[in-house]
Amino acid sequence: LCYKCVEACGTDAQNTFAIAVAGRGFDARISTEFDVALDDSACVFCGNCIGVCPTGALVFKSEFDMRAAGTWDESKQTRTETVCPYCGVGCVLELHAQEERIVKVTSPADSTVTEGHLCIKGRFGWIYAGDSRPRE
């Protein structure tokens, strides 16, 4: 276990401590605090655990779906840096686009503002970009 998601959810970024280590020794595994369902945990769905996962155990849903369909192709993706429009913090966003559609948003680890971390709006708010359908 590398614990990067636990650290991102804890003291490193979010301070919600929704992800923890459950079990001991050979039974140790990454889980939610008190081993409850994610919806019942302290998770704020910021996605910082996804952003730091080096193994691919945690990935963006868009990436998972595109990989399953065989359409995910990083060699065809462009990256564009911009600033998050949702608040005044000024987080640096890196938009990953494939076939002129945003497929995921990350933040550079060397960013002095975010150090690679984002809130839920910065990381997942892109789903509203370019979508003209009315939302409820």
List PLM regions with ranges.
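N-terminal export/assembly segments and adjacent metallocofactor-ligating motifs
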Residues: 1-136
